[in-house]
């Protein structure tokens, strides 16, 4: 904790020789500048020299406006990485560097930065909080070892927090909680922690609790009670940068603080004792006195329980007022895991061979080869001065500059010249990226995509074997786009630049899609939401200077094959033939183990091209060395897949909308491979035309529309009017109405019991506001409704409730559109 850093005698004597040892006994009003800690973090040469056990890869996750970026900026400042504090309102943050981010005051894309703290290296990824940018969070979580969840103390556990928490739980990421904005009227630390226990279904330990001055009259948040060390940390009001802290002992002379400290310590020891027997032993050895158990033992137990996902450490603060951030940073280094303490990632081979992986002292070892380097590309972006960048997490080995890497998706080899680590948008060139670290491969236009696995070897350029070159790390799921907007260049001469810029954005953000409606000649952009496409429009027109018109944003409807039985398609010439069938599919994931199946999860489409279904001519030419075609068998096989995929994207027979929930089975294909001629374009066209031939049966195709799960949070007094509006105007099917009160939530029994058992200190600020009473009468309406009817719903909801209600929604699936509904839509 922060107190150990402030009061550790050896450290202080090392850093500040003139500090007298006698002053350390005068602790009640000891005033120390945290600049000492910043100096301590710079005792080593560079952060790249930090050993793997002292490396932390963490994400900052939360609902929008909870204070993620504000907290991250303070962490950067206190680490000594920046000499100023960046503020969202002033548009000068390190991590929010896009023009659109600074203008809107929100995070749009993930940002990575590396900071030093307490002789540790913390790789931080700051993520967006808005639901439209969920994909940025998804791909961040895949490469992290832990996360800090930031909560607004007034709003509590909000909808997007629950979603992100579930995503992190699925990946078994250890997490910490930081209850922010404790300085605001209506802030409820204990109420928020109780929501954490029940809504997020997790145990907690309170590492610190809030301290208020004038708590009976006009409570003012001034610091925290350190439950581990029994200290009161008060941030000096005169210090606007939050570096000077008064550290005081907590004893019987401060009865109210002492009572909170004792009860919080008792709850901590009892919770840890249920997990770690060493805590029970220490409790018994210390005459059953909760206060006598050493901070070192408690820290070890909390760390072990956090990494094991048994519980979550809780901290509090007010980041905008620069209070409470340093203890949070200590918690990150104390409790979240190093890359050596995380589960082995899911590793597969495209050839379906078994891949061995084990954790060693220097990181993951794959296939018993400590010199084999394997990394995952989780983001691609175009830097203003450095050009294309591929962000990569290295899992094993060491990626070295000027080395050869293999992209297992394409099989291509690339010579990597420069490697970087990022500090917001500022790159720093490095010689290598070691296992467990995050860095950037620079200088490649389209060679790396999100989700690619890169493989290299430390000994030679040829050391990556055939099997190793097919290694694939866990995929990154891409959610389906829900909204469309057409884009048209001003003139034909503007089209090339427009397409180039769209390609750049799609490489950066795979949740953004583009296709062309051939009948209308329109280019259609598809995204996750209205804000997502608005940001795309801003970047194209303002940042990239594209001369084009973007039409109004509309719901992304789809067409789909709805015939009850498969329909056959055929295209043939004298030398090329493709025969296939098309049918409807409900769940594309059920085809994961089918031979030759290619799954397009975002559209729920499947294309199956088994290798055994090539013609005898093709197969015999492969086996008999009579192959004359300049393209390989694998490239021709891929051409068939790509041709089918293009046909699905060009749309259905009615309105040319992209096909969804469609299965294409290729039953036979043939090409003259014994002749030396280019076959990829004609074979791709043949597959495309075979699919197109099925579209002639228009009566076998119908429309699908996005269906959403909706939760509306509303006061009891407004519930009737809101429910009526949902069911009538929004055509919603209301499933249930529940109290938002924690006492009535249907959660696991153990979570209810845990919430009742937990010690939670008084919420002084809530007793001074009507928010507490309002909270007790809130209702939650659960419904499902077509996405089209939810466009602009927030403004309508605010109008109905005087701005007091909120809602969230998540994608449920695609639903077939009935004829009566079709008439309403089109």
From Swiss-Prot:
InterPro entries: EF-G-like_DII (IPR053905), EFG2 (IPR030851), EFG_II (IPR041095), EFG_III (IPR009022), EFG_III/V (IPR035647), EFG_V (IPR035649), EFG_V-like (IPR000640), G_TR_CS (IPR031157). SMART domains: EFG_C. The keyword rRNA processing does not apply. GTP binds at residues 62-69, 126-130, 180-183. One of its GO terms (cellular component) is mitochondrion. It comes from the Eukaryota. One of its GO terms (biological process) is regulation of mitochondrial membrane potential. Residues 1-44 form a transit peptide. Residues 53-340 form the tr-type G domain. Keywords: GTP-binding, Mitochondrion, Nucleotide-binding, Protein biosynthesis, Transit peptide. Its main location: mitochondrion. GO terms for molecular function: GTP binding; GTPase activity. It is found in: Mitochondrion. Pfam families: EF-G_D2, EFG_C, EFG_III, GTP_EFTU. HAMAP family: mEF_G_2. Belongs to the TRAFAC class translation factor GTPase superfamily. Classic translation factor GTPase family. EF-G/EF-2 subfamily. PANTHER family: RIBOSOME-RELEASING FACTOR 2, MITOCHONDRIAL, TRANSLATION ELONGATION FACTOR G-RELATED. Mitochondrial GTPase that mediates the disassembly of ribosomes from messenger RNA at the termination of mitochondrial protein biosynthesis. Not involved in the GTP-dependent ribosomal translocation step during translation elongation. This is Ribosome-releasing factor 2, mitochondrial. It comes from Lodderomyces elongisporus (strain ATCC 11503 / CBS 2605 / JCM 1781 / NBRC 1676 / NRRL YB-4239) (Yeast).
């Amino acid at each position: 904790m922060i107190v150990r850093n402030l009061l550790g005698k050896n450290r202080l004597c090392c850093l500040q020789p003139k500090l007298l040892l006698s002053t350390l006994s005068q602790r009640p009003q000891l005033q120390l500048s945290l600049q000492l800690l910043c100096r301590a973090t710079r005792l080593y040469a560079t952060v790249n020299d930090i050993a793997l056990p002292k490396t932390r890869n963490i994400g900052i996750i939360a609902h929008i406006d909870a204070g993620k970026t504000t907290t991250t900026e303070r962490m950067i400042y206190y680490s000594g990485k920046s000499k100023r504090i960046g503020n969202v309102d002033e548009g000068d943050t390190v991590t929010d560097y896009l023009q659109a981010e600074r203008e809107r005051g929100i995070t749009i894309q993930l940002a990575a930065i590396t900071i030093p703290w307490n002789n540790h290296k913390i790789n931080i990824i700051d993520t967006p909080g808005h639901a439209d940018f969920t994909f940025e969070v998804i791909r961040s979580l895949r490469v992290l070892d832990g996360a800090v969840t930031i909560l607004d103390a007034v709003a509590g556990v909000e909808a997007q927090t629950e979603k992100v928490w579930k995503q992190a739980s699925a990946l078994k990421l250890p997490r910490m909680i930081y209850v922010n904005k404790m300085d605001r009227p209506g802030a409820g630390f204990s109420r928020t922690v109780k929501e954490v226990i029940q809504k997020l279904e997790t145990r907690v330990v309170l590492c610190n609790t809030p301290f208020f001055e004038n708590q009976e009259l006009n409570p003012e948040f001034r610091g925290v009670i350190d439950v581990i060390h029994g200290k009161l940390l008060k941030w000096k009001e005169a210090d606007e940068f939050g570096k000077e802290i008064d550290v005081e002992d907590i004893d019987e002379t401060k009865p109210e603080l002492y009572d909170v400290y004792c009860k919080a310590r008792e709850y901590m020891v009892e919770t840890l004792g249920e997990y770690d027997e060493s805590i029970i032993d220490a409790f018994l050895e210390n005459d059953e006195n909760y206060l006598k158990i050493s901070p070192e033992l408690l820290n070890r137990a909390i760390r072990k329980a956090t990494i094991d996902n048994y519980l979550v450490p809780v901290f509090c603060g007010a980041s905008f007022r620069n209070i409470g951030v340093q203890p949070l940073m200590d918690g990150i280094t104390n409790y979240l895991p190093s890359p050596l303490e995380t589960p082995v990632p899911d590793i597969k081979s495209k050839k379906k061979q078994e891949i061995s992986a084990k954790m060693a002292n220097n990181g993951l070892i794959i296939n018993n080869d400590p010199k084999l380097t394997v990394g995952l590309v989780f983001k691609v972006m175009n830097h203003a001065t450095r050009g294309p960048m591929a962000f990569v997490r290295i899992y094993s080995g060491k990626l070295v500059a000027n080395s050869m890497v293999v992209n297992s998706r394409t099989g291509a080899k690339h010579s990597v010249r420069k490697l970087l680590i990022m500090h917001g948008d500022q790159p720093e060139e490095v010689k290598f990226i070691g296992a467990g670290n995050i860095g950037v491969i620079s200088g490649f236009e389209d060679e790396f995509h999100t989700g690619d696995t890169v493989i290299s070897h430390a000994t030679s350029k040829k050391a990556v074997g055939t099997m190793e070159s097919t290694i694939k790390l866990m995929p990154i799921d891409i959610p389906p786009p829900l909204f469309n907007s057409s884009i048209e260049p001003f003139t034909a001469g503007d089209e090339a630049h427009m397409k180039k810029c769209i390609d750049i954005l799609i490489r950066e953000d795979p949740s953004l899609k583009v296709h062309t409606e051939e009948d209308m000649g329109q280019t259609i952009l598809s995204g996750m939401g209205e804000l997502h496409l608005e940001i795309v429009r801003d970047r194209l027109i303002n940042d990239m200077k594209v001369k084009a018109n973007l039409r109004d944003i509309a719901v992304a409807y789809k067409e789909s094959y709805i015939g009850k039985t498969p329909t056959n398609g055929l295209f043939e010439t004298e030398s090329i033939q493709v025969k296939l069938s098309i049918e409807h599919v409900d769940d594309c994931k059920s085809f994961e183990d089918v031979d030759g199946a290619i799954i397009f999860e975002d559209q729920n489409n499947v294309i199956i091209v088994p290798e055994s279904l090539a013609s005898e001519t093709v197969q015999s030419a492969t086996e008999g060395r009579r192959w004359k075609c300049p393209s390989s068998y694998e490239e021709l096989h891929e051409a068939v897949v790509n041709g089918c995929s293009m046909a699905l994207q060009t749309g259905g027979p009615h309105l040319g909308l992209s096909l969804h929930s469609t299965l294409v089975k290729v039953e036979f294909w043939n090409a003259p491979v014994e002749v030396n001629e280019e076959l990829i374009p004609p074979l791709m066209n043949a597959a495309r035309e075979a699919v197109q031939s099925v579209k002639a049966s228009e009566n076998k195709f119908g429309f699908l529309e996005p269906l959403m799960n909706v939760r509306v949070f509303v006061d009891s007094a407004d519930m009737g009017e809101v429910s009526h509006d949902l069911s009538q105007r929004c055509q919603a099917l209301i499933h249930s109405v529940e109290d938002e009160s924690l006492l009535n939530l249907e959660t696991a029994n153990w979570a209810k019991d845990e919430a009742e058992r937990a010690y939670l200190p008084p919420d002084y600020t809530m007793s001074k506001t009507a928010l507490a009473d309002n909270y007790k009468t809130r209702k939650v309406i659960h419904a499902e409704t077509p996405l089209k009817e939810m466009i602009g719903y927030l403004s309508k909801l605010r109008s109905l409730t005087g701005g007091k209600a909120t809602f969230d929604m998540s994608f449920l699936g695609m639903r077939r559109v009935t004829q009566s509904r079709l008439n309403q839509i089109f």
